[in-house]
């Protein structure tokens, strides 16, 4: 097995700095996008309720048209 290579402290500092900055950016971005996604999900749920209600009404009307006395 190959022995580990000595890495410059400056390179280590750069790597860990980039890691920390990436994590900080990700947390900030997540906090920015989370409320927007919640709003989109809420609107999608409202639209789904409206579509389901409309389909239910259409289905009831279709059944009422089929169930006439003059069959």
Curated annotation (Swiss-Prot):
The keyword Membrane applies. GO terms for biological process: proton motive force-driven ATP synthesis. Signal peptide: none annotated. GO terms for molecular function: proton transmembrane transporter activity. Pfam families: ATP-synt_E. It comes from the Eukaryota. The keyword Ion transport applies. The modification N6-acetyllysine is found at residue 34. One of its GO terms (cellular component) is proton-transporting ATP synthase complex. Keywords: Acetylation, ATP synthesis, CF(0), Hydrogen ion transport, Ion transport, Membrane, Mitochondrion, Mitochondrion inner membrane, Transport. Disulfide bonds: none annotated. It is found in: Mitochondrion; Mitochondrion inner membrane. Component of the ATP synthase complex composed at least of ATP5F1A/subunit alpha, ATP5F1B/subunit beta, ATP5MC1/subunit c (homooctomer), MT-ATP6/subunit a, MT-ATP8/subunit 8, ATP5ME/subunit e, ATP5MF/subunit f, ATP5MG/subunit g, ATP5MK/subunit k, ATP5MJ/subunit j, ATP5F1C/subunit gamma, ATP5F1D/subunit delta, ATP5F1E/subunit epsilon, ATP5PF/subunit F6, ATP5PB/subunit b, ATP5PD/subunit d, ATP5PO/subunit OSCP. Subunit e, of the mitochondrial membrane ATP synthase complex (F(1)F(0) ATP synthase or Complex V) that produces ATP from ADP in the presence of a proton gradient across the membrane which is generated by electron transport complexes of the respiratory chain. ATP synthase complex consist of a soluble F(1) head domain - the catalytic core - and a membrane F(1) domain - the membrane proton channel. These two domains are linked by a central stalk rotating inside the F(1) region and a stationary peripheral stalk. Belongs to the ATPase e subunit family. This is ATP synthase F(0) complex subunit e, mitochondrial. The gene is ATP5ME.
